[in-house]
């Protein structure tokens, strides 16, 4: 009932954040984002994102505080734009150098910030639900928009939910599905395509998931049922509204990173859902406890065997699928599972990866989704987000604290399922 001043009353907030792990995460983020931002500038060349998106820059200018302040002073459009085009000394944030003093106009600074790619990253202990890492963006002083909480299109990181629902409803992991491009008359002749535009052959569930085959993800969704898949997603912890359309198989829904990791926490924790939390206690200046967290809610939402099957299938993503650069580029030939995700027009790149002790989610994209790479090779999750996970894991494994992670292993699925998983994934 007492009102406290967070800044003056000497309150002590004890959180679950692991200072060592957070340090490794920030180092990995900064290293990759400098490289990625440079690649983005090189990719754009002389073409600006607003050259084709005419109202992109205009909207950003009119939404700026500078424009609004001048408008409140009674200035008209032309005087406002003239004032905003005047160069003056200002401090801006650069991905390469941090705070930098420059001569720049207000409009130039708006252009600068429009092109900056932002990371979001969260790491959670699946058994306890303790949030160990939280990175909401490049620098909180300049970017208060928290990328971990921002709802964004999720792309293929949603596919494991589709396959998990299918297995729950009786799909066999050794059944083969035709990688054919087809139209769906009942859905306005919607014709999903694969990102590489390659078709043909037959894949098992494991093969289709590891190679992120869109055509088969849609088949699997419709075989299970859209409503049944949505119910399964909600049970695994996703609370966001999911449109009852077949494109959810390809991740058309907008879901925050903090929420999208919840199914993966469930797979890593043997089918038990645990609510992530970050605040342990609040004490006053005399050490009296004002708040103490309750143990997080734990609930079995899928059988342990089903979770083990999903971890086995998601391990194949790393060993032979879209996440294999974790082995090739980062030397992480250890038990890991995960999934890449790339959204429409490469607006966002995702990667969610885990071992039995930690689940890590990463998303990278500009604040405005109309600012993006125009190349799938550069804008895919394996290039945008996965490297942060790879660098982070390297740092952890080189430390005394987390070196033991390299010796961890996932629980094996039941014998019959192991046999199903062992069949060739493509024919």
Question: Where does each model-flagged region fall?
Answer:
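Short acidic (Asp/Glu) and glycine-rich catalytic loops that position anionic groups and cofactors
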Residues: 2-8, 140-142, 186-189, 210-212, ...
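Mid-domain, small-residue-enriched loop/turn segments at the edges of structured enzyme/sensor domains
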Residues: 190-194, 225-262, 271, 275-278
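A penicillin-recognizing enzyme superfamily signal
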Residues: 15, 19-35, 65-125, 130, ...
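C-terminal substrate/ligand-recognition segments
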Residues: 114, 119-131, 158, 164, ...
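Non-catalytic, structured segments within soluble enzyme domains
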Residues: 1-75, 220, 234-235, 239-241, ...
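Active-site rim segments in enzyme catalytic domains, especially the processed small/beta chain
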Residues: 146-187, 320, 394
